[in-house]
Regions:
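Surface-exposed, short loops/turns at beta-strand junctions within beta-sandwich domains
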Residues: 115-122
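Short edge beta-strand/loop segments characteristic of extracellular beta-sandwich folds
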Residues: 45-54
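Aromatic sugar-binding surface patches on proteins
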Residues: 79-115
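Beta-strand signatures of extracellular beta-sandwich domains
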Residues: 59-63
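Short, small-residue-biased leader/transition segments that mark boundaries at the very start
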Residues: 1-2
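Edge beta-strands of extracellular beta-sandwich domains
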Residues: 134-143
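Short, compositionally biased P/S/T/A/G/V-rich stretches that sit at domain boundaries
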Residues: 5, 10-45
Length: 143
């Protein structure tokens, strides 16, 4: 998936700012990984939330099985977790020729960790809000 940052400018200010994945709708702003899908072993007991254009001005909240929304604390932001799909593509069985400039970043600020309160959770919904009034939601089911 190729993504580009899109800026909407009005006068001398940014009116909106988001990522746009090639062949994906503008609303596609995050991907949720289920238990066991993290690249790092220590995070495989929970969910990994990849919020593509996250910035410190965003709010990230989770809702487990339709309970109340909970804002994720700042320590849930992972600084050294790779995106699983990028990792598998670059280092998996069908990996392309080694190109250091094209490999997934191991140091990023848009991956979050959330461990559901209940081991028998059914659905976790993530809501990410940016300062431009955009609210993005995505859900994952426990299968």
């Amino acid at each position: 998936v190729y993504k580009r940052q899109v800026y909407e400018i009005e006068g001398n200010r940014i009116r909106n700012w988001y990522y746009k994945g090639t062949a994906f709708p503008r609303e596609y702003q995050m991907y949720l990984y289920g238990p066991g899908e993290a690249v790092s072993e220590k995070y495989r007991d929970g969910l990994i939330l990849n919020i593509f254009n996250w910035h410190t001005t965003w709010t990230v909240e989770v809702q487990e099985d339709n309970a109340g929304w909970v804002t994720l604390p700042s320590d849930s932001n992972l600084r050294y977790e790779m995106d699983r799909r990028a990792y598998d593509f670059m280092f998996g069985d069908t990996k392309p020729e080694h190109r250091p400039t094209a490999e997934p970043e191991s140091n990023n600020d848009h991956m979050f960790y959330y461990k559901p309160a209940s081991e028998s959770w059914g659905t976790v919904t993530v809501r990410a809000s940016d300062p431009y009034g955009n609210v993005y939601t995505e859900s994952i089911r426990n299968e």
